[in-house]
Design a protein with these regions (language model features):
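Intrinsically disordered, charged low-complexity linkers and terminal tails
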Residues: 1-109
Length: 109
């Protein structure tokens, strides 16, 4: 008899997790390993968020919808978790988004 095994993603990415990261001041590294980041603002109405790096520079808002699209492509295998690949879909965000997804464990499966 063959057992059917459901594959569950190993990452914990979600809108709720992003809000939790902001509330708990959780820090993570950008993909280049040079910038430590954290989420400093959440806009529930626009469903977007802001990040701040270790030197105090705050990003412009990133819409969760864009992040979710990239996340799905990574897990479906149509996009690799590399900064320059992500930059094609979300210009200038590749380094930060890649680091965020690595924090969530998207590179583990």
């Amino acid at each position: 008899m063959i057992d059917i095994i459901e594959i569950i993603p190993k990452c914990s990415f979600s809108w709720e997790k992003l809000k939790e990261m902001k509330d708990q001041d959780i820090k993570f590294w950008a993909a280049d390993g040079l910038n430590q980041l954290r989420i400093v603002g959440i806009d529930e109405k626009q469903k977007s968020f802001y990040m701040i790096n270790q030197s105090g520079k705050i990003t412009w808002p990133l819409r969760y919808e864009n992040l979710e699209e990239v996340h799905d492509k990574i897990h479906h295998g149509t996009l690799t978790l590399l900064s320059y690949e992500i930059d094609r879909l979300i210009p200038t965000w590749g380094n930060y988004v890649s680091g965020l997804f690595k924090y969530f464990g998207c590179d583990k499966g």
